[in-house]
Amino acid sequence: MKRQVFTDMLLVRIAEGYSLADRRYITRVLLSLLLVAGNIGLFNLQAQQPAIPIILQAGKNLGKSEYFVDYIYKYKPTPQDKDFNEDIIRLELGTSIVKSYSYRLWQADSALTHAANKSAPMRTPSGDLSPFWYYRDLTTGRTQVWYRTPLAGPILRYMDTPTFTWSITGQKKTISGYETQLATCLFRGRNYEAWFAPSIPISAGPNLFGGLPGLILELRSTDGEHHFTLDALQKRSADIVEWKVRLVKEVSRPQFRDYCQRLHKHPMQTFKSNGQRVYPQNEQGDFLSEAEALDWQIPYNPIERE
Protein backbone atom coordinates (compact mmCIF):
# COMPACT_ATOMS: atom_id res chain seq x y z
CA MET A 1 0.00 0.00 0.00
CA LYS A 2 1.30 3.42 -0.92
CA ARG A 3 1.47 5.44 2.26
CA GLN A 4 2.10 9.00 3.23
CA VAL A 5 3.08 10.50 6.51
CA PHE A 6 1.81 13.68 8.08
CA THR A 7 4.30 15.27 10.41
CA ASP A 8 2.52 17.44 12.96
CA MET A 9 5.29 19.98 13.32
CA LEU A 10 3.54 21.77 16.18
CA LEU A 11 3.65 18.61 18.29
CA VAL A 12 7.23 17.58 17.56
CA ARG A 13 9.01 16.77 20.80
CA ILE A 14 12.46 18.30 20.50
CA ALA A 15 15.07 15.90 21.81
CA GLU A 16 16.38 16.46 25.29
CA GLY A 17 20.04 17.35 25.35
CA TYR A 18 19.79 20.12 22.76
CA SER A 19 20.63 23.58 23.99
CA LEU A 20 17.87 26.15 24.34
CA ALA A 21 19.19 27.99 21.27
CA ASP A 22 19.16 24.77 19.25
CA ARG A 23 15.63 23.94 20.41
CA ARG A 24 14.46 27.38 19.33
CA TYR A 25 16.22 26.92 15.98
CA ILE A 26 14.56 23.53 15.34
CA THR A 27 11.17 24.85 16.40
CA ARG A 28 11.45 27.85 14.06
CA VAL A 29 12.47 25.63 11.14
CA LEU A 30 9.57 23.25 11.70
CA LEU A 31 7.00 25.96 12.32
CA SER A 32 8.02 27.81 9.18
CA LEU A 33 7.47 24.64 7.17
CA LEU A 34 3.83 24.64 8.24
CA LEU A 35 3.33 27.97 6.50
CA VAL A 36 4.59 26.83 3.11
CA ALA A 37 1.90 26.44 0.46
CA GLY A 38 1.09 22.85 -0.30
CA ASN A 39 1.73 21.62 3.26
CA ILE A 40 5.30 20.35 3.29
CA GLY A 41 4.33 18.03 6.14
CA LEU A 42 2.67 15.61 3.71
CA PHE A 43 5.12 13.57 1.72
CA ASN A 44 5.45 10.30 -0.15
CA LEU A 45 7.04 7.54 1.86
CA GLN A 46 7.98 5.58 -1.22
CA ALA A 47 10.59 8.26 -1.92
CA GLN A 48 13.57 9.52 0.03
CA GLN A 49 12.81 11.53 3.15
CA PRO A 50 12.68 15.26 2.33
CA ALA A 51 15.82 17.23 3.10
CA ILE A 52 14.99 20.38 5.06
CA PRO A 53 17.01 23.58 4.47
CA ILE A 54 19.53 24.50 7.15
CA ILE A 55 21.53 27.61 8.03
CA LEU A 56 25.08 27.45 6.64
CA GLN A 57 27.76 29.63 8.18
CA ALA A 58 31.22 30.12 6.73
CA GLY A 59 33.90 28.12 8.49
CA LYS A 60 37.57 27.67 7.73
CA ASN A 61 39.03 28.14 4.26
CA LEU A 62 40.14 24.76 2.87
CA GLY A 63 41.83 26.06 -0.28
CA LYS A 64 41.17 27.57 -3.70
CA SER A 65 39.07 26.12 -6.48
CA GLU A 66 40.26 25.87 -10.07
CA TYR A 67 36.97 24.62 -11.51
CA PHE A 68 33.28 24.53 -10.69
CA VAL A 69 31.68 21.38 -12.09
CA ASP A 70 27.96 20.56 -12.22
CA TYR A 71 26.59 17.07 -12.85
CA ILE A 72 23.01 16.06 -13.50
CA TYR A 73 22.44 13.17 -11.11
CA LYS A 74 19.64 10.72 -11.90
CA TYR A 75 18.87 7.80 -9.63
CA LYS A 76 16.13 5.27 -8.95
CA PRO A 77 14.64 5.35 -5.44
CA THR A 78 14.19 1.57 -5.72
CA PRO A 79 15.53 -0.93 -8.27
CA GLN A 80 11.95 -1.59 -9.40
CA ASP A 81 11.20 2.05 -10.25
CA LYS A 82 10.90 3.00 -13.90
CA ASP A 83 11.25 6.72 -13.19
CA PHE A 84 14.32 8.55 -11.93
CA ASN A 85 14.73 11.26 -9.32
CA GLU A 86 16.98 14.10 -10.42
CA ASP A 87 19.37 16.47 -8.68
CA ILE A 88 22.37 18.65 -9.57
CA ILE A 89 25.64 17.77 -7.85
CA ARG A 90 28.21 20.56 -7.75
CA LEU A 91 31.95 20.21 -7.29
CA GLU A 92 34.16 23.03 -6.10
CA LEU A 93 37.38 21.55 -7.42
CA GLY A 94 40.87 22.47 -6.34
CA THR A 95 44.19 20.72 -6.86
CA SER A 96 44.28 19.38 -3.30
CA ILE A 97 40.67 19.62 -2.05
CA VAL A 98 37.23 19.01 -3.53
CA LYS A 99 33.83 19.88 -2.10
CA SER A 100 30.73 18.09 -3.45
CA TYR A 101 27.09 18.85 -2.62
CA SER A 102 23.53 19.13 -3.94
CA TYR A 103 23.37 22.48 -5.73
CA ARG A 104 19.57 22.64 -5.50
CA LEU A 105 19.59 21.99 -1.78
CA TRP A 106 22.37 24.57 -1.35
CA GLN A 107 20.14 27.14 -3.09
CA ALA A 108 17.43 26.51 -0.49
CA ASP A 109 19.99 26.63 2.33
CA SER A 110 21.33 29.95 1.03
CA ALA A 111 17.86 31.45 0.81
CA LEU A 112 17.27 30.56 4.46
CA THR A 113 20.75 31.61 5.61
CA HIS A 114 20.56 35.06 4.00
CA ALA A 115 16.87 35.76 4.63
CA ALA A 116 16.35 39.12 6.31
CA ASN A 117 13.40 37.69 8.26
CA LYS A 118 14.35 34.19 9.34
CA SER A 119 10.95 33.64 10.96
CA ALA A 120 9.22 34.00 7.59
CA PRO A 121 8.27 30.89 5.59
CA MET A 122 11.40 29.31 4.15
CA ARG A 123 11.96 28.26 0.59
CA THR A 124 11.70 24.47 0.46
CA PRO A 125 13.29 22.46 -2.35
CA SER A 126 11.10 20.28 -4.52
CA GLY A 127 11.98 16.70 -5.32
CA ASP A 128 14.17 14.19 -3.55
CA LEU A 129 17.58 15.83 -3.27
CA SER A 130 20.81 14.33 -1.99
CA PRO A 131 21.20 14.97 1.76
CA PHE A 132 24.97 14.32 1.55
CA TRP A 133 27.90 16.66 1.17
CA TYR A 134 31.61 15.85 1.07
CA TYR A 135 35.06 17.38 1.56
CA ARG A 136 37.82 15.22 0.10
CA ASP A 137 41.53 15.77 0.64
CA LEU A 138 43.04 14.78 -2.71
CA THR A 139 46.52 14.32 -1.23
CA THR A 140 45.44 11.68 1.32
CA GLY A 141 42.06 10.51 0.04
CA ARG A 142 40.48 11.19 3.44
CA THR A 143 36.92 12.36 3.05
CA GLN A 144 34.54 14.09 5.44
CA VAL A 145 31.03 12.79 4.78
CA TRP A 146 28.09 14.85 6.07
CA TYR A 147 24.45 13.73 6.06
CA ARG A 148 21.36 15.67 7.12
CA THR A 149 18.83 13.41 8.80
CA PRO A 150 15.11 13.93 8.02
CA LEU A 151 12.86 16.55 9.59
CA ALA A 152 15.48 18.81 11.19
CA GLY A 153 17.22 15.96 12.99
CA PRO A 154 20.95 16.04 13.74
CA ILE A 155 23.61 16.28 11.04
CA LEU A 156 25.72 13.11 10.98
CA ARG A 157 29.42 13.35 10.16
CA TYR A 158 31.97 10.60 9.63
CA MET A 159 35.40 10.13 8.08
CA ASP A 160 35.99 7.84 5.12
CA THR A 161 38.97 6.86 2.98
CA PRO A 162 37.51 5.21 -0.11
CA THR A 163 39.76 3.18 -2.38
CA PHE A 164 39.08 2.44 -6.04
CA THR A 165 40.57 -0.30 -8.21
CA TRP A 166 39.99 1.02 -11.71
CA SER A 167 40.64 -0.84 -14.95
CA ILE A 168 41.42 1.72 -17.66
CA THR A 169 40.35 0.70 -21.15
CA GLY A 170 41.35 2.05 -24.54
CA GLN A 171 37.81 3.18 -25.33
CA LYS A 172 37.41 6.93 -25.83
CA LYS A 173 34.67 9.48 -26.49
CA THR A 174 34.27 13.26 -26.47
CA ILE A 175 32.18 14.94 -23.76
CA SER A 176 31.58 18.70 -24.05
CA GLY A 177 34.72 19.08 -26.14
CA TYR A 178 36.94 17.05 -23.80
CA GLU A 179 38.43 13.75 -24.91
CA THR A 180 37.65 11.16 -22.27
CA GLN A 181 38.67 7.59 -21.63
CA LEU A 182 36.62 4.75 -20.14
CA ALA A 183 37.50 3.06 -16.84
CA THR A 184 35.57 0.44 -14.89
CA CYS A 185 35.55 -0.74 -11.29
CA LEU A 186 33.58 -2.48 -8.57
CA PHE A 187 32.98 -0.15 -5.62
CA ARG A 188 30.98 -1.01 -2.51
CA GLY A 189 28.58 -3.39 -4.18
CA ARG A 190 28.08 -1.73 -7.57
CA ASN A 191 29.94 -1.91 -10.88
CA TYR A 192 30.73 1.47 -12.43
CA GLU A 193 31.77 2.91 -15.76
CA ALA A 194 33.56 6.25 -15.60
CA TRP A 195 34.61 8.54 -18.43
CA PHE A 196 37.51 10.71 -17.29
CA ALA A 197 39.40 13.58 -18.95
CA PRO A 198 43.22 13.23 -18.84
CA SER A 199 43.47 16.88 -19.95
CA ILE A 200 42.07 17.88 -16.53
CA PRO A 201 44.59 16.00 -14.36
CA ILE A 202 42.70 16.23 -11.05
CA SER A 203 41.71 12.88 -9.56
CA ALA A 204 38.13 13.66 -8.59
CA GLY A 205 34.49 13.15 -9.49
CA PRO A 206 30.99 13.49 -8.03
CA ASN A 207 30.44 12.70 -4.35
CA LEU A 208 33.56 10.88 -3.12
CA PHE A 209 34.52 9.28 -6.43
CA GLY A 210 38.03 9.67 -7.81
CA GLY A 211 41.22 7.69 -8.15
CA LEU A 212 41.69 8.21 -11.90
CA PRO A 213 44.36 10.28 -13.74
CA GLY A 214 41.81 12.92 -14.67
CA LEU A 215 38.46 14.44 -13.75
CA ILE A 216 35.44 12.15 -14.11
CA LEU A 217 32.95 13.77 -16.52
CA GLU A 218 30.44 10.92 -16.59
CA LEU A 219 29.78 8.11 -14.13
CA ARG A 220 27.13 5.39 -14.20
CA SER A 221 26.41 2.21 -12.32
CA THR A 222 26.05 -0.63 -14.80
CA ASP A 223 22.72 -1.63 -13.24
CA GLY A 224 21.36 1.69 -14.52
CA GLU A 225 20.25 2.92 -11.09
CA HIS A 226 22.72 5.83 -10.67
CA HIS A 227 24.01 8.13 -13.41
CA PHE A 228 26.04 11.36 -13.26
CA THR A 229 26.43 13.34 -16.49
CA LEU A 230 28.34 16.59 -17.01
CA ASP A 231 26.08 19.64 -17.11
CA ALA A 232 28.59 22.50 -16.80
CA LEU A 233 32.32 22.95 -16.29
CA GLN A 234 33.95 26.34 -15.84
CA LYS A 235 37.30 27.62 -14.68
CA ARG A 236 36.68 29.56 -11.48
CA SER A 237 38.95 30.61 -8.65
CA ALA A 238 37.14 30.90 -5.33
CA ASP A 239 37.62 30.00 -1.69
CA ILE A 240 36.50 26.46 -0.84
CA VAL A 241 34.89 27.03 2.54
CA GLU A 242 33.91 24.43 5.09
CA TRP A 243 30.34 25.04 6.23
CA LYS A 244 29.56 25.44 9.92
CA VAL A 245 26.23 23.88 10.89
CA ARG A 246 24.37 23.17 14.10
CA LEU A 247 23.40 19.88 15.71
CA VAL A 248 26.32 17.79 14.47
CA LYS A 249 26.75 14.23 15.70
CA GLU A 250 30.06 12.43 15.07
CA VAL A 251 29.67 8.78 14.06
CA SER A 252 31.70 6.05 12.41
CA ARG A 253 30.83 4.76 8.95
CA PRO A 254 29.44 1.48 10.41
CA GLN A 255 27.29 3.51 12.81
CA PHE A 256 26.05 5.65 9.93
CA ARG A 257 25.14 2.61 7.84
CA ASP A 258 23.34 1.10 10.82
CA TYR A 259 21.38 4.34 11.28
CA CYS A 260 20.30 4.44 7.62
CA GLN A 261 19.20 0.81 7.70
CA ARG A 262 17.18 1.44 10.87
CA LEU A 263 15.68 4.62 9.41
CA HIS A 264 14.31 2.71 6.44
CA LYS A 265 13.44 -0.58 8.16
CA HIS A 266 12.10 0.89 11.41
CA PRO A 267 11.34 4.56 10.66
CA MET A 268 8.88 5.13 13.51
CA GLN A 269 11.35 3.95 16.14
CA THR A 270 14.18 5.91 14.51
CA PHE A 271 12.22 9.16 14.39
CA LYS A 272 11.23 8.67 18.01
CA SER A 273 14.86 8.21 19.03
CA ASN A 274 15.58 11.58 17.37
CA GLY A 275 12.84 13.22 19.42
CA GLN A 276 10.43 13.42 16.48
CA ARG A 277 6.82 12.30 16.17
CA VAL A 278 5.30 11.37 12.84
CA TYR A 279 1.77 10.25 12.05
CA PRO A 280 1.48 7.87 9.07
CA GLN A 281 -1.65 7.87 6.93
CA ASN A 282 -2.92 5.55 4.22
CA GLU A 283 -4.05 6.65 0.75
CA GLN A 284 -7.49 7.49 2.09
CA GLY A 285 -6.02 9.89 4.65
CA ASP A 286 -6.80 7.66 7.63
CA PHE A 287 -4.21 7.50 10.36
CA LEU A 288 -2.61 4.10 10.75
CA SER A 289 -2.96 2.15 13.94
CA GLU A 290 0.10 1.90 16.15
CA ALA A 291 0.71 -1.67 14.96
CA GLU A 292 0.38 -0.65 11.30
CA ALA A 293 2.71 2.30 11.80
CA LEU A 294 5.34 0.05 13.35
CA ASP A 295 5.16 -2.20 10.26
CA TRP A 296 5.79 0.72 7.90
CA GLN A 297 9.09 0.49 6.01
CA ILE A 298 10.74 2.90 3.57
CA PRO A 299 12.30 1.47 0.37
CA TYR A 300 16.07 1.65 0.56
CA ASN A 301 18.43 1.78 -2.43
CA PRO A 302 21.69 3.47 -1.32
CA ILE A 303 24.40 4.20 -3.83
CA GLU A 304 26.83 2.39 -1.49
CA ARG A 305 25.54 -1.13 -0.91
CA GLU A 306 28.47 -2.21 1.23
Where are the model-predicted features located?
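Bacterial Sec-dependent N-terminal signal peptides
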Residues: M1-Q57
